[in-house]
Amino acid sequence: MATSTLKNVRFAGMATCVPKRVISNLTDCKPQLRAERERLVRNIGIETRRMAQEWQCFSDLAFDAAERLLESLEWKREEVDALIVVTQSPDYLAPATASILQDRLGLPHSTVAFDVNLGCSAYPFALNLLGSLIAAGGVKKGLVLVGDRGASVNDPIFSDAGTATALEFCEGAPPMHFDLNSDGSGYKAIILPVGGHREPVGVQHLMPFREDENDHWHRAIDLQLDGTAVLSFSTQRVPPAVEKLLDYAGASKDEVDYFVFHQANRMINETIRKKLGLPVEKVPSTLRDFGNTSGASLPVTMTARINRELEAGRNRVLLCGFGIGLSWGTCLVDIEGAKFPDLIES
C-alpha cells in the first residue's frame, strides 16, 4: 500500500489489560536451563512476561480493556458504530470473536463487527482500517481491539495482552499518516504451520519432541520462528520505513515526541534505534517487564510507559509494528486530550 493520510479522525483514547500472572525467564525454568536463560535475557532483554490463566482468552483481556476505555470516555454503547478485533488468538475458528465481543460489550446491532488476522505489525494496520471507515463518513465512533494469547512457560519471548483503542470523527483533527507494507515471500519466518486447512491438526502434532541437546522441547503445533531471518528483515526494513513516512508527512525526527516500536527483542530494537539515531528517552520500552506481546506491544508500551505524558498535552507519536507476514506498518499521529487509563491487571 502506498503512503496515505486520514483526515478528520481523532485518537480518543486507549486502555490495556494484561494477566496478573507473572512468569520469570530466570526462575520459572528447569535448573539445567538457568545459565542459558541468563545469557538469553542479556541478549533479548526480557526478564518477566505475563501469561493468561488456562481459562482466559485474549477476548477476556480485550473485553476488560474496552470496558475501562468506554467508562473513561463516557461513551454510550449505542454510539459505537464499529468494532474491529485484530488477533491471531480468536476464541473459535468461527464465528468471529468481534461478534462475540459486540454482544458482551452491549453494543447495538447496528455496530459493524469483524475480525482481522494479523500479529506483530497489527496496530498501525488496525488504526488505518478503523480510521478509514471513519474518514469515509459511515462511522462516527469506533473501537479496535488488538492483542494475542501466545505465552507459555517454556517460551521466553511472548506475553499475553488485550488492548482497546477508540477513534472518532472530529472535523479538523490533525491528519494521521500511514505507510503499510507486506512481503509474503517471507511467510515461513514466523509461522504456525499446523492447525489450518493446509495442515490440519493430528495426534502426531501434539507429541513433544526434543529440539536439541540443551533439553529444549517443541511440538509441531507450536509457533516456529526463524530468528536470523526476522532479525535481518526487521533491521533492514524498519529504519527506511520510518524515514519514508517522516519525509511523506513533512516532519523531522526532532518534531516527534515519541517513537514507539513493536517490542521484538533488545537486539532488534536497539539496532533500529541506533540506525535511526534516536535518543533513548524518545523510545519507550516494555521488553524487560512484558516481553513481546505481539500486536498489542505498541499499546502496552504507550499505556505502561508514557500514558501520563500522552494525557498531559499534545504529543506527536510515531508508531511502528513489524513481523509476521512478513509485514510492517508505520503511523504518525498527533494525540491531544485522549484518555489513557492506567494498566489493568486481570
Describe each model-derived feature in a short phrase.
Residues 1-55, 155-232, 236, 240, ...:
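Condensing-enzyme catalytic core mediating Claisen C-C bond formation in acyl metabolism
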Residues 12-15, 86, 117, 142-148, ...:
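Short beta-strand segments
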Residues 28-35, 60, 89-100, 264-267:
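A structural motif shared across PLP-dependent enzymes of the aminotransferase-like
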Residues 46-48, 79-84, 103-116, 151, ...:
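Glycine/charged-rich beta-loop-alpha catalytic/anionic-binding loops adjacent to active sites
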Residues 59, 63-66, 89-90, 108-110, ...:
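Claisen-condensing/thiolase-fold acyl-transfer catalytic domains that form or cleave C-C bonds
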Residues 65-81, 240-257, 305-310:
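Phosphate/pyrophosphate-binding loops at sites that engage ATP/ADP/AMP, CoA/4′-phosphopantetheine
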Residues 135-162:
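Flexible, glycine-rich active-site loops centered on histidine and acidic residues
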